[in-house]
Amino acid sequence: MVNWVGKRMRRLGAIASMALTLAAVAPADAADALSRVLAMPKASLLVEEGGREAISRQPDRPMIPASTMKIVTALRAIQRWGLDHRFHTDFHLADDNWLWIKGLGDPYLVSEELDLVVATLKRQGLRSVAGVGTDDSLFAADVQIPGRSSSNNPYDAPVTALAVNFNTINVVRSREGVRSAEPQTPLTPLARQLAQPLASGTHRINLQERELAVRYAGELLAAKLSAAGIPVGGGLRTGRVPAGAARIYRHHGTRDLRAVIESMLEYSNNFIANDLFLLLGDDGDGQPLSTAKAQRAADAWARKTFGWRDHRIEDGAGLSPGNRLSARQLLDAVKAFAPYRELLPSQNGRVRAKTGTLSGVSTYAGFVQRNGGWEPFSLLINQPAPHALRLDVADELAGAPPGLR
């Protein structure tokens, strides 16, 4: 058994004992990242090898997990719906010939999906509509995601049951005017309006408010209908689908849950994570889905699945600084996620893990490849730290030279 990690940890006073030690000797400079983490007062680290704890540093201390919370959300979604699940959106035609789109929480309703919708409606015989109505009532009107700010950053986009293109608009502003930055996405009146004050360049605009997000969904659908030769007579309405309106089409997204989760984890998409978080709060009572309902569902799941107690899950993306998980709790989720390990982002082929970053928070959790197998780890740093430190720790655990990513 190799003793160098054990000696380092004894010198640092990080742990009293260790079940196993790292199996491969690493150069002294490669060990620096691990030593630094073990010396940090506000850092927790838990590594298993062969089903036993290999490194344990403050494993039961509640910490802010940041975006590693997305592993928990992904696991819950898979357990609830299965990897083959496809989200859907309903389309209704009212007696006054208004076409209504009812959002049911599909997080990946993008421009290309609307093209498929319009093509199907046209094939079914839709020739014109009096106007487009939008129904976003699945989510409560007062939904507020803890930790989400009102900034224009795309990761702060509002979470709505009816959302297109992740509630963002991609535009190019130049001296010639404004144009869409995406060939598949026509420029709508709202997009033009929001882009006017911007400096020259390409911009991803966060729609910021629920009303703007729902309006944009209606405008984009109307533009797609018109482009396909289906005239839209009136304007836009927002409300509930009128009683008696016939459902003429249910569109199932082309991406299954596997693809949705893989994208969420790779790009750390907060919109997708919190959309799933709200949907997971559906208890079948027919009431709008709220943040409070989603939080209660998450807490009940954590207690039933893992027996957690000293935890707090305020949102599904890890945006909230009020979230709390210990390294041991996060490792519980990581180990349960083992069958879906390849959905996690890859680091140099020897690490599959999810990062998390907030101000003064740097986290990393997933799997490192060691001795022909994949071993789980969770690292939670709740104090200022270099961005690359967590990656270097994972490299070190995997026996790879730091920085080769």
Stretches with model-predicted labels:
Residues 64-77:
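Active/ligand-binding-proximal structured segments within catalytic/core domains
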Residues 312-405:
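C-terminal soluble interaction/assembly domains
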